[in-house]
Amino acid sequence: MVIIMKLLEETLRRIKPADEEVIKKAWSRMDSLSKPIGSLGKLEEIAVQISGITGKVKNEINKKMTVIMCSDNGICEEGVSACPQELTALLAENYVKEITGIGVLSKHVNADMCVVDIGIKSDVKDSRILNKKVAYGTKNMAKEPAMTREEAVKAIETGIELVDKFVKEGYDLFGTGEAGIGNTATSAAVISVLSQIDSDKIVGKGSGLTDEGFLNKKRAVKQAIEINKPNKEDVIDVIAKIGGFDIAGICGCFLGAAKNRVPIVIDGIISASAALCAYKMNANVKDFLISSHLSAEPGIEYVTGAIGLKPCLHMEMRLGEGSGCPLQFFMIESALCLMNNMATLAEASIVDSEFLVDIREK
């Protein structure tokens, strides 16, 4: 069967790397500011990275949004989560009420949210939740493929379409979030296959499991990989067999952001697994990714290591939802504010600056 995926193929063709010439100009300005070279650390790197993304040395964020993909996972049948599956729909409904972690933090930093039903097992009633349902949850990947290849492509393209739409509406900074009971299991499976690392090293306790439950989760993830035998060279095959609609949709968001040349933030382990998928499809995606925090889930370090990213925050967070994105939005806007408004050495009347050495780590 021939699968139509024109949007995905076009998107992958259009993703180009960051502008190296503008990056050089941005570093030249950053290093001319009235401070020891490198003294603003990660803030300097963020500002310069965004210059390379946009093609402009000075940048401002006009509108920012976290896209939250909500979906259920059939592997919950294996008892891989301490939470009931019905919680996915409830979380989605609470997101739009702005009473969850991501809702409160987004409001605090004046960021918008788009809550998407991409595969919740039930029909949610709140009209503020965008209905992009591919199916009523995935199948139990410990027994069969989680979804068809067609469904995987549809979910990925949903993410691309949403970013395309929001860029046209003026959004120029994106975050990624999710809700999906059991999705730390699917994320661990995807990361294990794409990074070729034993799943036992990647599976974490998620929302909290007993020691017995943790062992069972490891078993279920390993069984899913062994039964489905996903092809590590084919990201769509990996997502279809052992992934989730949320992972696929977020992967599409990363691809869409890279195509549209806007920065996009990784939250925790689920969006990190989706980022790894996007990176494996087109390595240029890396230039548009900003890793918000080092999740307490063990798999995150394998992802950031594989892509070559350094999480900005180390706060022992593991909530998910996209909760790291609003925190990172504030850091990004702070970095751009410094680049745009800080005085240069000359403007600050620091004529003899030879004493200011480069203190960056080599």
From Swiss-Prot:
Its EC number is 2.4.2.21. InterPro entries: Nict_dMeBzImd_PRibTrfase, Nict_dMeBzImd_PRibTrfase_bact, Nict_dMeBzImd_PRibTrfase_N, Nict_dMeBzImd_PRibTrfase_sf. The active site is at E321 (proton acceptor). Transmembrane segments: none annotated. Pathway: Nucleoside biosynthesis; alpha-ribazole biosynthesis; alpha-ribazole from 5,6-dimethylbenzimidazole: step 1/2. One of its GO terms (molecular function) is nicotinate-nucleotide-dimethylbenzimidazole phosphoribosyltransferase activity. GO terms for biological process: cobalamin biosynthetic process. Pfam families: DBI_PRT. Keywords: Cobalamin biosynthesis, Glycosyltransferase, Transferase. Signal peptide: none annotated. It catalyses: 5,6-dimethylbenzimidazole + nicotinate beta-D-ribonucleotide = alpha-ribazole 5'-phosphate + nicotinate + H(+). Belongs to the CobT family. HAMAP family: CobT. Catalyzes the synthesis of alpha-ribazole-5'-phosphate from nicotinate mononucleotide (NAMN) and 5,6-dimethylbenzimidazole (DMB). This is Nicotinate-nucleotide--dimethylbenzimidazole phosphoribosyltransferase. It comes from Clostridium tetani (strain Massachusetts / E88).
